């Protein structure tokens, strides 16, 4: 079973993603440095959870961006 993140962590990740979309990568360590730079979190555990969910959220959003384009290509190939 996977981790379940609180609403606060999800909200913070969405705000970070919206503001700094160009800096975020699919690498956990890079995202951890972004969290350290832009979010004032004193707890190491919470900071790591934010960085981990940010990495996962980035991958999900990246898939959503590429999915509609792939579907259009498949439809045009079938016709």
From Swiss-Prot:
GO BP term, example: translation
InterPro entries associated with the record: Ribosomal_eS17, Ribosomal_eS17_CS, Ribosomal_eS17_sf
Protein name: Small ribosomal subunit protein eS17
Keyword Ribonucleoprotein in record: yes
GO molecular function, one term: structural constituent of ribosome
Domain of life: Archaea
PROSITE patterns assigned: RIBOSOMAL_S17E
Organism, scientific name: Saccharolobus solfataricus (strain ATCC 35092 / DSM 1617 / JCM 11322 / P2) (Sulfolobus solfataricus)
Transmembrane segments: none
Gene field: rps17e
Example of a GO cellular component annotation carried by this entry: ribosome
Pfam family membership, one: Ribosomal_S17e
Presence of keyword Ribonucleoprotein: yes
């Amino acid at each position: 079973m996977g981790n379940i993140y609180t609403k606060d962590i999800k909200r913070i990740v969405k705000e970070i993603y919206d503001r700094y979309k160009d800096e975020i990568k699919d690498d956990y360590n890079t995202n951890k440095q972004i969290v350290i730079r832009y979010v004032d979190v004193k707890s190491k555990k919470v900071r790591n959870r934010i960085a981990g969910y940010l990495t996962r959220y980035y991958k999900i959003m990246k898939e959503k961006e590429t999915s509609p384009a792939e579907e259009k290509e498949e439809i045009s190939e079938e016709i």
